[in-house]
């Protein structure tokens, strides 16, 4: 099972969190550090990928419109995560709107092969994401604190260095509560994106969430 992750920020942390969660379901191969290009991933795969790996989690960097499309042809992701669209690297892209076009190439590639993409509700401010969700509503899940999110972060409280988090799946009418140990308000969203994706990949992970979140590495 192949999972691609992109976004203006948060993708490395989400990658590590998701890999840790999926480990309870099977061996995970994921790109170390911030390796996110075809060349870097190719070298990494040749050095470390083994036949026994069940999951491949790939960080996918955008260096221009079309770069994630090329990465997607290489990785062939079954699932995808878009963490955010921000104004980093606008000098490279020309505008935030062009960044959104580039990042949306991942969910477009995923839904084209019948897969599922989990995206931050924040990116729905950009037309490419609204378009792909309108065309494939059953293959896109939005996550965030916003009322309109498909999976809403309903509760997040930090107690003694541990977040108590409740996610509300507004479409299914279900809730999931779990604990998460990484400090920083931004890691609430990072953990929510990883959790929703992990449940899409293997719903049984929900039964083991308290066990899989405590050993996640603190990523800057």
Question: Where does each model-flagged region fall?
Answer:
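Acidic, Mg2+-coordinating active-site environments of NTP-dependent enzymes
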Residues: 82-220
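Phosphate-binding loop of NTP-binding sites
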Residues: 1-117, 121, 131-135
């Amino acid at each position: 099972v192949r999972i691609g992750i992109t976004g203006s920020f948060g993708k490395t942390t989400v990658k590590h969190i998701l890999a840790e969660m999926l480990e309870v379901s099977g061996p995970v191969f994921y790109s170390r550090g911030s390796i996110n290009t075809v060349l870097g991933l190719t070298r990494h795969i040749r050095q470390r990928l083994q036949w026994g790996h069940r999951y491949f989690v790939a960080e996918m960097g955008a260096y221009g419109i079309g770069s994630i499309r090329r990465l997607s042809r290489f990785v062939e992701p079954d699932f995808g995560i878009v963490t955010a669209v921000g104004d980093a690297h606008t000098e490279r892209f020309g505008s935030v709107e062009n960044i959104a076009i580039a990042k949306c190439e991942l969910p477009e590639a995923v839904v084209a092969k019948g897969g599922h993409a989990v995206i931050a509700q924040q990116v729905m401010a950009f037309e490419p994401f609204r378009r792909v969700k309108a065309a494939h509503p059953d293959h896109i899940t939005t996550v965030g604190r916003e009322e309109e999110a498909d999976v809403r972060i309903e509760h997040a409280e930090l107690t003694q260095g541990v977040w108590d988090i409740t996610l509300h799946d507004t479409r299914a009418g279900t809730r999931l509560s779990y604990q998460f140990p990484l400090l920083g308000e931004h890691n609430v969203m990072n953990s929510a994106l990883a959790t929703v994706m992990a449940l899409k990949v293997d719903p049984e992970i929900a039964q083991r969430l308290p066990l899989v979140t405590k050993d996640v590495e603190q990523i800057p």
